[in-house]
């Protein structure tokens, strides 16, 4: 049995003072959550080392951002309370919330301070535990201001809070939402007369008494009142990502260009990869990441508030260089425990995580039966296979990046491998049946659609169903039948074909899908 990598144990000790016990050994070939078959010893070691990095529980000292939704990759990609009860890379019932609003010119506002309408309200990701990990650190208390709790004498403002504030003289606080705007801002505390009052100096003298609001950043982000689009988005399982990463771009572009039946079209989401090269996206519900590295770095940044350097690859500047502030509000300077600027996660650890994810084996389908074989025929005749394309072959001579900036030797387990993810990796208009999402169009590119979604890869579908995870992007479809019927837009004719099936054909189709 493989031992936990020694560097992982040391890493855990460095990351936080209250970490759980070391996890079980990484799964081996053939085990659920194990690596691809046929890996060399050196590649297996990369998988095991990356596993140790993937399951780290982050805290503010090591770079967990103030705008975090969770404390580690495993929470969204592990299907368990922790690594002792789940499997790294697995599906999860954890979902994220995205928000934004339409502008008057029908462009979309991500409420993140960018674009034509630069309103920064912390969008488009709502960070459900923002600041929670910071509340026990000096300078990070979060308290409400009493309804009449802001008064002024000369230039000295006294703030009265509804609970013990825990602030100290000299520390910076953020006063937000107090009725008279002149009381709001970031200030150094001049005195602390009691545990529910503190004072600061304000250059705006003779302001009327006011109150309400907070002396804090919010304990967690909330959906802003002016947001007109709110979407729940499920976390994805990570099995087989390295195979998908190595689908030739030309194959995805060919899918987009192909003539299709039943009114189906589909578009590739052409975006810049981590090196600035425009390529079709392959990962994410909106196909907003080209590579495993980009997918991982974006998740680290958007879900954990962890910034990432891109200097190892020769690209200018940083990949995700600047932390977002909760609700778009400045974070108190006294509450910045991170000592790892400019990036929170080292390039080496980013590479280790992508190595682990790239070497994760896909979940194999169940052995075929006469019913599932018949169901596959129905799958094709109904038109499901137009968007859920079965097979691809990876490119030749695949290598992975190393922590030193070089490349591994060729990995046969990722090279010229035929596999079956069941997706065209295109975006399709799903109509009103699957609307409510944040648009896929990048900032500043004009019109956006809420109803465009990738064709979800169907491999591993049985695993999602076994863990009682709902289907579709928001997890609200509780069965395969419900998910199929919810398809609209481009898929309307295919849904009609499905509804017209005999009971036998329908049962066979569902059995086939349940076997994936």
Stretches found by the model and what they are:
Residues 142-219:
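Small/polar beta-strand repeat architecture
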Residues 4-142, 216-516:
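Periplasmic c-type cytochrome electron-transfer domains
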